[in-house]
Amino acid sequence: MRGYHGDRGSHPRPARFADQQHMDVGPAARAPYLLGSREAFSTEPRFCAPRAGLGHISPEGPLSLSEGPSVGPEGGPAGAGVGGGSSTFPRMYPGQGPFDTCEDCVGHPQGKGAPRLPPTLLDQFEKQLPVQQDGFHTLPYQRGPAGAGPGPAPGTGTAPEPRSESPSRIRHLVHSVQKLFAKSHSLEAPGKRDYNGPKAEGRGGSGGDSYPGPGSGGPHTSHHHHHHHHHHHHQSRHGKRSKSKDRKGDGRHQAKSTGWWSSDDNLDSDSGFLAGGRPPGEPGGPFCLEGPDGSYRDLSFKGRSGGSEGRCLACTGMSMSLDGQSVKRSAWHTMMVSQGRDGYPGAGPGKGLLGPETKAKARTYHYLQVPQDDWGGYPTGGKDGEIPCRRMRSGSYIKAMGDEESGDSDGSPKTSPKAVARRFTTRRSSSVDQARINCCVPPRIHPRSSIPGYSRSLTTGQLSDELNQQLEAVCGSVFGELESQAVDALDLPGCFRMRSHSYLRAIQAGCSQDDDCLPLLATPAAVSGRPGSSFNFRKAPPPIPPGSQAPPRISITAQSSTDSAHESFTAAEGPARRCSSADGLDGPAMGARTLELAPVPPRASPKPPTLIIKTIPGREELRSLARQRKWRPSIGVQVETISDSDTENRSRREFHSIGVQVEEDKRRARFKRSNSVTAGVQADLELEGLAGLATVATEDKALQFGRSFQRHASEPQPGPRAPTYSVFRTVHTQGQWAYREGYPLPYEPPATDGSPGPAPAPTPGPGAGRRDSWIERGSRSLPDSGRASPCPRDGEWFIKMLRAEVEKLEHWCQQMEREAEDYELPEEILEKIRSAVGSTQLLLSQKVQQFFRLCQQSMDPTAFPVPTFQDLAGFWDLLQLSIEDVTLKFLELQQLKANSWKLLEPKEEKKVPPPIPKKPLRGRGVPVKERSLDSVDRQRQEARKRLLAAKRAASFRHSSATESADSIEIYIPEAQTRL
């Protein structure tokens, strides 16, 4: 801290008096916690050993802190100075030794006090310590070079402290972090965090190396500390307090109780201890988190009484400002590691699900001072139940959450996983969802910049990098190893497990697999805690150990206007997969759709979500990602969608992509429209060998088909069947799905469907054989479609009908060709025969083949865009129009054949026109005969006119459908893009 001058409100007490003062305090007093630097953070847990009495560790219990104030090498109580046990919680054991001042704990200059054990011996002993002495995962902290070995501290001219990282300092830091937990709700504007704010790099973490900060005033010379060790250690700490330079010379630096607070602005009250953070990059001595002296310490550290969940272990007894001053709340509002829920022993399993924005903001501030405002009301004596953990839900905490509901529900001490899931699924897309984006997802997705554990706070763009570094320094050292172990053990997709109560429970009660706790430390062996635990974004929902109760869920909530891009994993694959993604969806319909897919059994090898967010810095990028994702469906059907008609089969394969984004709603509207069978939309039937023809609507009614095939100009998207541009195109059905034309077959221009009769010469045999095999296979296979059809006309039925039509047409073609060969027919009749046969072959090779492929697709369970039966019916109706045209030609040929291939009708037709002009010219005497003559012609002509009118009407409907299809083709993509 800044200057610790004697006039700070308590007289400077030399370290030699620290023992007596702390002895006065009695068992309530605690040893300060000295944290090692965050230097090379070893993955295996380190356990700090007491300085005096190395062999003093009971295998099953923590080193009892009640061993009495056995004087350590420095004259301080060994138990206090070293933190008799690896216990990370201050008051775990009733008999803990009295506090010794941080100065005692901090390495004194060489020659001051009894020499400590060599750091190497301490290191060896620590390595030999049992892995979990007291059932806690004691947070391992590797000593920085300054703290670990001799050598003058950088910022101090004094001799180096041999071991500046005592377990007491570790405990102190843990304690401070707990206090920080308790006050993690105080999230106001970070404006006044100057003291421990961005410039904290100037603060040397511990006495080992004090980097004179910009405002630190350089070495201790500027701050006349009480003792050189006192002053050495404090200088190291406030050496980093860059923003305190203005306070360097004034009396505000004098610590109240042996200079615990140097920063007048918010440290006026002794309500917290500053955990001096060092930017993660700086090597240096460990942090010295000093406990207050004597009476102040009794107030500030209270034993956990009765395990009441409402009390923050670290903060319940936090001394209220002895001088009545209150810390400026604005200064310390955000100084919490936001591990708050963890600090509450009684937190329920769901308690870890805190407001994500709170977490995000909280993790950026690691300073442990707590606003005096919230606690100022409590007596300085500090009752046990003073600071309930539920204060996490109060005021600014909820403000940060932006959602009181989420704050209350998340803050509730014991939230059942069901309740949590219910809240998550019912909560609308409010700040909580966005917070979940910022909080839940990034742990898995942010590459953590090689900083252990919580070191990288989730920057929401408003938190400065220096604060992140400070948080990384403190929280990384405190929670790095344990979090990496917990996250790796659980393989959680999103939530910071460290946030959850179980982290503290594991540390506090040593219950690595308590019933209430997730098996945080269930697999510590398998998890070598990575120093730079960068949570790689695992693309599939990872498995969670069986004991997990409140499975965190990653919810990549790309909240956009449509929000179909909302991917959600449910971390635990419970009996009913809960999708928490419904919250972010704009409408309940979309949410319901997302949840409908939830119970789908997880696939063996889950497909990565379509939206893989590598980093989620903020909501804007999510919006951009959502927009990118929205754009895709506008140019075609999204390939990875679950077909409503084939949900049973496809949902397993495509669980995470919930369908066409914007067409999700449009599909249903179009599906309703498509019930009118003839409301057709064109799709040209020209040879599709060229990809460019996919978007061209030809006007030839003979080459138009499809009631409800609306073609968007969409190039084939990579899908289950990677289409080749030469063969495939995507036809978007108005009913539901885009399906790929050219399904398994290349377009064979004159190919006719396999028929028993001899096929015309142009028909290629292989194509027919392939289709025959498909017909046989399709006829044996039941239509695999989940869509209930209003009529029994399914793909199989249509194939049968189509086969009958094809056989009839082919029979006519063969008959006419034989007639042409057998008889010497006039050229006009031959032209008619060629016209009829050519039209028939064209029809068979294109429209019939296309419809046959549609029928195949409707029966093929592996086909991706399964045409609905309504689509088949509409196409069949349009196909009947073309068949009718061909049939008329053959009927005419049949008449000619019946007339011995004499062109009778053409002669009569020549006669027919004259009667029309002759009517007015003829006299009234003749008309009877002519009427009798004309009556036959007239009837014939009227019938022909009616037929032509019917054909024109059909072709007009067809062309109008084509035009409407063109317009739809133009506008629907725009609508989708707008949406």
Swiss-Prot record:
Topology in membrane: Peripheral membrane protein
Location(s) in or outside the cell: Cell membrane; Postsynaptic density; Synapse
InterPro entries the UniProt entry points to: SAPAP
UniProt-listed Pfam families: GKAP
Phosphoserine found at: S58, S406, S409, S412, S416, S643, S645, S932, S935, S967
Disordered: region residues: 1-20, 52-95, 136-169, 182-291, 400-429, 537-581, 741-790, 908-940
Compositionally biased tracts (Pro residues): 540-549
Start-end of Basic residues biased regions: 221-246
Keyword annotations from UniProtKB, A to Z: Cell membrane, Membrane, Phosphoprotein, Synapse
GO molecular function: amyloid-beta binding; molecular adaptor activity
Bias type Basic and acidic residues, positions: 1-10, 190-202, 769-779, 927-940
GO biological process annotation, one example: modulation of chemical synaptic transmission
Stated role: May play a role in the molecular organization of synapses and neuronal cell signaling. Could be an adapter protein linking ion channel to the subsynaptic cytoskeleton. May induce enrichment of PSD-95/SAP90 at the plasma membrane.
Subunit annotation: Interacts with DLG4/PSD-95.
Name of the protein described by the UniProt record: Disks large-associated protein 3
Gene: DLGAP3
